Amino acid sequence: MQDEKVFIDRLLHPKTQHEAFRELLQLYQKPLYNHIRNIVLNHDDTDDVLQNTFIKVFQNIKNFKGKSKLFSWMYRIATNEALSFLQQKAKKQGISNVEAQQKALNKLESDVFFDGDEIQLKLQKAIATLPEKQQLVFKMKYFEELKYEEISEIVDTSVGALKASYHLAVKKIEEYLKVN
């Protein structure tokens, strides 16, 4: 944790903040991209949300209190940015979040950046049937292999509730895959 404190100090100091922020980008760009991509599904939208995430991190690093890990704090920002983006996109299109997600899934098949096979696509369709929170928990646990404690810090939910949510999500996905 001491190393993180030193790193945050470098992010805050005018003489070292640009170099430190470059390091932050190198360290977290790929995992945050994957996290956001799991939520918004579209490559171009993911790039936009990722850029907004790093802008918010840079603008708000001075407000980071150190109550959680920097990683968790940034993931929370990325999660909120991605969910807000989806809500705004659905609102602009005059459709519900569920309908917007279905449209995104339909586009996923033709997305040149989607490297999954038919099984992966079926899994994404199964995940899309889950409530938003269960989707988020499932994706963070299954795809990103985050620990429950890390997810707890990111989504501000107890570990017990996360375990229950993940278990329910797995059951629903299994059921969907059996039927389809």
What positions do the PLM features span?
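Sigma70-family region 2
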Residues: H13, F54-K69, K89
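Hydrophobic-face residues of short alpha-helical interaction/recognition segments
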Residues: L32, I36, I61, M74, ...
